[in-house]
C-alpha cells in the first residue's frame, strides 16, 4: 500500500520537536527569522517521500487481536496470515532495497525521532500502540508517478505459516478457504 493512503494524518510525518529543531538550525545557518526558516523548510516536505513509499504492515503479537479484526475487516470474510520475521525477509523476491522494522509509538508533540527519510515511516502515534506493528517498506528509485500499491513477488511457501479466520466466520467460509489452500498447494495450518 502507498504510505500516503493511510487514514492517520500523521503517517510518515515528522514530530513537532524535530520540526522545531530544524527551524532553529535553519535560522542559525541562514541567519533568518522563524517565518523565513519555516518557509525554507516547506520546500523539503517529507510527504514527497511518503507518497513514493510502499508499506506492508504486520501485527507481531503472540495472539489474535479482536481490535484488529474489527478495525481491518468489514465482514466476517477475511483471513490473517502468520509468518516469522526471517520467513518474511526470505519470502520477498525483489532486488529493490526493502527495509524491515518494528514501529515505535511516540507522542508527536514531545518526542523526537532520528533525522532522515526512513524514521518517519517507522514511528506512529501512541494511540495506535494496540496494533503492535512490524512494517516492511520499499521506496522505489524509479517511481515518478506514485500509485496506490505496488506488486512485489513473494514465495508464499516461505511466507505463510498459518492462516487464521475471524471468530465470526461461518462454516462455509472455513470450507472455502480449505479448498483454496488445497487448490494452490499451500502448506500451512488453518
Regions found by a protein language model. Give the residues of each.
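Partner-binding and oligomerization surfaces adjacent to conserved cores of proteins
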Residues: 1-190
Amino acid at each position: 500500500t502507498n504510505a500516503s493512503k493511510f487514514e492517520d494524518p500523521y503517517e510518515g510525518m515528522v514530530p513537532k520537536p524535530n520540526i522545531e529543531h530544524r527551524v532553529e538550525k535553519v535560522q542559525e545557518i541562514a541567519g533568518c527569522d522563524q517565518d523565513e526558516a519555516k518557509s525554507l523548510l516547506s520546500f523539503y516536505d517529507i510527504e514527497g517521500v511518503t507518497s513514493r513509499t510502499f508499506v506492508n504492515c504486520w501485527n507481531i503479537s503472540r495472539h489474535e487481536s479482536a481490535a484488529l479484526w474489527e478495525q481491518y475487516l468489514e465482514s466476517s470474510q477475511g483471513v490473517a496470515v502468520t509468518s516469522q520475521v526471517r520467513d518474511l525477509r526470505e519470502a520477498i523476491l525483489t532486488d529493490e532495497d526493502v527495509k524491515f522494522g518494528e514501529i515505535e509509538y511516540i507522542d508527536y508533540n514531545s518526542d523526537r525521532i532520528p533525522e532522515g527519510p526512513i524514521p518517519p515511516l517507522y514511528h506512529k502515534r501512541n494511540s495506535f500502540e494496540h496494533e503492535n506493528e512490524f512494517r516492511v517498506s520499499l521506496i522505489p528509485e524509479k517511481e515518478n508517478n506514485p500509485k496506490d500499491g505496488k506488486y512485489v513477488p513473494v514465495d508464499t511457501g516461505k511466507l505463510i505459516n498459518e492462516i487464521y479466520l475471524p471468530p465470526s466466520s461461518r462454516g462455509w467460509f472455513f470450507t472455502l478457504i480449505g479448498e483454496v489452500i488445497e487448490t494452490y498447494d499451500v502448506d500451512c495450518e488453518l
